Amino acid sequence: MAKTNSTSKNNKLEIKSVFAYQAFDSRGFPTVACEVVLNDGSKGLSMVSSGASTGEKEALELRDGGTKYHGKGVTKAVNNINKKIGPKILGVDATLQTQIDEFMIELDGTKTKAKLGANAILAVSMAVCRAAAKSLNLPLYQYIAKKVAKVKGADFILPVPMLNVINGGAHADNTIDFQEFMIMPVGAKTMAKALQMASEVFHSLQKLLKAKKFNTNKGDEGGFAPNLKSAEEALDLMSQAVVDAGYALGKDVAFALDCAASEFYSKEKQAYVFKKAVKAGILSEEKGTKTTEQLISYLEDLTKKYPIVSIEDGLDENDWKGMESLTKKIGKKVQIVGDDTYCTNPELTSKGVSLSATNSVLIKLNQIGTLTETIQTINIAKKANWTAVVSHRSGETEDAFIADLAVALSTGQIKTGSMSRSERIAKYNRLLAIEMQLGNKAKYLGSKTFYNLSTPAATPKKSPAKKTTKAKSKK
């Protein structure tokens, strides 16, 4: 990479060394870690996450194949950093984030980053960013906002968390086909209060599951993974847990779903098959199979019964017409999030905007592979009056970069797992630290985060059984 005029031997932001190694994610599989050191000694360490249910259009995560680690090793990606990327960015000003990212994209030369690996490129992108922030003595979120994304304004919006309390689909070995059942503390006024509410509902749910003789095993993202008969049963249990914790459904705590419908879409049948429920004998194959229209109607019915404010990947990632229909039908009151459809790709997100396919985009750094392209996607969504939800992956690490990213871009929402497993809690603890640091400059919007919906978080028509002692909305 060509050096710029701003770079000299005396420039404290000059990249001095780049070193990558193989670390482990929360599932015990290898992942890429990278350390970038600047001339002044400032260090930036990054660790890349990995998904279980992945979109067809994601940038390529380079794995070794073979027998070691069941083919999941990442020594190829590590070597690409140490031998191909690192040597070419030595001496470059670390604040040139966009130029460094664009150089790595050009060096790779493929549309999906298949040559060097998106996991290799992202590890360097994140580590460079963190090293520069440390050198300038700026919190990471502030550095990203002011120096990388060029965000204007003094206030930062803290994200409303989507907490995955019941896991299914590819994230759990149980009978539920929908992948994530989440709670959102929309009635809170601060991040601290939001996480208090989330913790209390989470533990109330655990007590409820035990009382009803369900197992309380955990899925990949820290939520419970009981064998349930339907999405309704999961939502009923969540509703009861909210009431047991002393909160009001819809007003204090709303629900969000990640259907991950591509995982149970049958190309052969051109239909959606709840295969886990069918395999368990809960549903016959006939009753467990739905057309696009039937699945849309089913999702609409769920939003009428429960305080669901967000549905992610309600249909197959390539079912553009179906997504348009879903958004047209319930998109005024429910956030319709595209994950696998867009894969944090600016071009695909622009296509979705032009079609009004959804009204929100999920943001996953490793789907696209650079911080620069991630910011581009968020900006495309915001310009279209869409929301953007910053997200973790099921194979996570203790790296809390996404917490800073959500605050830096004021996305207003973050999806980063349940109230268990330290790789998930690391993000929440980071958000608490940011809130304390910002003081009165920190804004938590609650239900107002759904700025493009007309009537979010409506009170559900279906109410759970009352708590033994009358539940009151906690203030």
Swiss-Prot record:
Q: PROSITE patterns, per this entry?
A: ENOLASE
**Pfam families (alphabetical):** Enolase_C, Enolase_N
Pathway, according to UniProt?
Carbohydrate degradation; glycolysis; pyruvate from D-glyceraldehyde 3-phosphate: step 4/5
Q: Which superkingdom does the taxonomy of this entry point to?
A: Bacteria
Q: What reaction(s) does this enzyme catalyze? A: (2R)-2-phosphoglycerate = phosphoenolpyruvate + H2O
Its top-level enzyme class, in one word, is: lyase
**Cofactor(s) the protein needs:** Mg(2+)
User: Record's InterPro entries?
Assistant: Enolase (IPR000941), Enolase-like_C_sf (IPR036849), Enolase-like_N (IPR029017), Enolase_C (IPR020810), Enolase_CS (IPR020809), Enolase_N (IPR020811)
Q: Which residues bind Mg(2+)?
A: D258, E312, D339
**Amino-acid positions noted as binding (2R)-2-phosphoglycerate in the UniProt annotation, renumbered to this chain:** Q179, K364, R393, S394, K415
Cite a single GO MF annotation.
phosphopyruvate hydratase activity
SMART domains linked to this entry: Enolase_C, Enolase_N
Q: Which UniProt keywords apply?
A: Cell adhesion, Cell membrane, Cytoplasm, Glycolysis, Lyase, Magnesium, Membrane, Metal-binding, Secreted
* Enzyme Commission no: 4.2.1.11
Composition bias of kind Basic residues appears in 463-475
Give the co-factor note.
Answer: Binds a second Mg(2+) ion via substrate during catalysis.
Where is this gene product found?
A: Cell membrane; Cytoplasm; Secreted; Cell surface
To which protein family does this belong?
A: Belongs to the enolase family.
Name by which UniProt lists this protein: Enolase
What species is this protein from? Mycoplasmoides gallisepticum (strain R(low / passage 15 / clone 2))
Q: What is the lineage of its organism?
A: Bacteria, Bacillati, Mycoplasmatota, Mycoplasmoidales, Mycoplasmoidaceae
**What is the gene name?**
eno
